[in-house]
């Protein structure tokens, strides 16, 4: 049997092998992080765990401001647009990222007392944060180029080594440190510095370009208007934890952070599918063959819905495994955030058209509306209904976010292509079915018998549709072609 599997694997097309390994790699990376969660929730108090997650939330915000998220958006698009000159393009953007990080580091050092007070962080934490902005950019530039070229072996090795080292080093530092929050954060920074620095020199050596006026201008003109979009995305995903810490307490922020982290397990499906589909979708748009996209997109949405329903169904057991009883309330926060993951994937499908046609102003408008609504709802409802309501405000905002991007996508497609890529009725059917089943499982949390009866019914339906589900998985693997 093993020989048969090995032979089948050897005869798979390169694009299928690459897609398979990208998915396995994403799973493994996230799995290690998840496996480490119950260790950190037990060697750190709920308050310390909350403080670390607030610190990490600040990192995601600072990353946007400092690096402009150059390794996303413009970079993926640029690898396709400048396919004849990828190495110089990659090296030039690495150089631009260095300049941006150094500039902001000097700005911080010149007024560090002011910035420390603004973020309520120490100098050590701030410098580690700036270092991680650079190291994460280095890795994402290198990894993006590997994915587009379907060169998966080196990417898998680097990703897995760093993924294993992060929790190992983190546990060792936290156990022996008095300041466990800073120790946990420094562990991440140290591993990334050692693991990713060499990748910077690899791309610089291959591209032999630090400064390119054309590439730098293209990247800045594309991504600066997107900064509000990226910041708004971070506000949608991180502001709730910061607001809970400030409006309630860090212990509540820790409980909410656990629910958010567990719900975000399924974001790896979003990432894996998006990384697999993005070059293919961009190529279809370029070839004006958008009719080919719909079937694959519907199947992808069904797959994302299924995996998130699995998380919602078993949330009580998952929370009890990953944290002590002090975190029990996190169970009730998991479902709305897991449902949000579905809408994150949906809006990404719609936004591909906005990115391709460089309609960054529309992307910015949708993102800012979602972020402002999220902050306003949290500010209004958390004092009234408690911090748990932040999960539902997140869901409401992502639903609105996806709807606005859908409307903008249709507007662009009518103008540029003269046709619409998706059928509104099919999208609505998939979405409403997903929400209905998700809330049924949530209602079953009051009764173990009822919940497992629902799980049994769902399992029977899933088994009867197993051929369809396998067809979806195979189709996701086969859409990739070398670009």
Q: Language-model segments: which ranges?
A:
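Interhelical loop/hinge segments that connect adjacent transmembrane helices in multipass membrane
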Residues: 2-11, 15, 153-157, 181-187, ...
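N-terminal membrane topogenesis motif
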Residues: 1-32, 91, 213-226, 466-483
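Membrane-interface junctions at transmembrane-helix termini in multi-pass inner-membrane proteins
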Residues: 82, 135-157, 207, 338-369, ...
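Helix-loop junctions and terminal segments of transmembrane helices
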Residues: 66-83, 263-288, 294-298, 351-356
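Transmembrane alpha-helical segments of multi-pass transport proteins
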Residues: 176, 370-373, 420-474
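Alpha-helical transmembrane segments of multi-pass membrane transport and lipid-handling proteins
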Residues: 2, 66, 70-72, 91-118, ...
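Hydrophobic alpha-helical transmembrane segments
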Residues: 127, 156-204, 368-373, 387-409, ...
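Alpha-helical transmembrane segments of polytopic membrane transporters and translocases
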Residues: 38-39, 49-66, 225, 240-242, ...
């Amino acid at each position: 049997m093993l020989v048969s599997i090995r032979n089948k694997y050897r005869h798979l097309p390169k694009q299928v092998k690459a897609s398979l390994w990208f998915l396995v790699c994403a799973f493994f990376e996230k799995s290690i992080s998840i496996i480490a969660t119950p260790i950190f929730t037990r060697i750190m108090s709920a308050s310390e765990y909350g403080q670390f997650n607030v610190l990490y939330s600040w990192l995601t915000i600072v990353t946007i401001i400092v690096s402009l998220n150059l390794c996303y958006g413009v970079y993926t698009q640029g690898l396709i647009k400048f396919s004849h000159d990828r190495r110089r393009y990659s090296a030039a953007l690495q150089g631009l990222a260095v300049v941006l990080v150094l500039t902001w580091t000097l700005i911080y050092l010149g007024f560090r007392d002011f910035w420390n007070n603004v973020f309520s962080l120490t100098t050590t934490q701030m410098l580690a944060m700036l270092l991680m902005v650079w190291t994460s950019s280095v890795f994402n530039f290198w990894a993006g180029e590997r994915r587009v070229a379907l060169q998966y072996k080196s990417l898998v090795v680097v990703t897995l080594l760093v993924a294993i080292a992060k929790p190992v080093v983190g546990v060792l530092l936290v156990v022996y440190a008095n300041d466990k929050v800073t120790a946990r954060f420094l562990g991440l920074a140290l591993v990334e510095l050692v693991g990713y620095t060499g990748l910077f020199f690899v791309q610089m050596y291959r591209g032999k370009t630090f400064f390119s006026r054309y590439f730098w201008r293209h990247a800045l003109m594309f991504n600066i208007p997107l900064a509000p979009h990226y910041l708004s995305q971070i506000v949608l995903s991180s502001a709730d934890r910061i607001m809970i810490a400030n409006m309630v307490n860090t212990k509540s922020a820790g409980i909410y952070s656990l629910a958010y982290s567990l719900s975000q397990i399924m974001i790896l499906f979003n990432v894996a599918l998006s990384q697999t589909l993005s070059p293919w979708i961009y190529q279809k748009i370029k070839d004006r063959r958008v009719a080919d996209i719909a079937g694959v997109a519907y199947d992808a949405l069904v797959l994302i819905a299924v995996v998130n329903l699995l998380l919602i169904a078993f949330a009580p057991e998952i929370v009890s495994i990953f944290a002590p009883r002090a975190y029990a309330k996190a169970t009730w926060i998991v479902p709305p955030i897991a449902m949000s993951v579905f809408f994150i994937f949906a809006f990404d499908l719609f936004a591909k058209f906005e990115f391709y046609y460089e309609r960054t102003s529309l992307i910015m408008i949708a993102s800012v509306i979602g972020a402002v609504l999220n902050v306003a709802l949290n500010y209004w409802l958390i004092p009234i209904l408690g911090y748990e309501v932040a999960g539902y405000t997140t869901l409401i905002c992502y639903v609105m976010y996806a709807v606005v991007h859908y409307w903008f996508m249709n507007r662009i497609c009518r103008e540029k292509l003269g046709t619409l890529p998706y059928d509104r009725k099919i999208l609505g059917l998939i979405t409403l079915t997903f929400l209905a089943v998700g809330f049924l499982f949530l209602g079953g949390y009051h009764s173990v018998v009822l919940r497992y009866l629902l799980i049994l019914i769902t399992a029977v339906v899933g088994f009867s549709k197993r051929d369809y589900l396998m067809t979806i998985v195979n189709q996701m693997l086969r859409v990739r072609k070398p670009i």
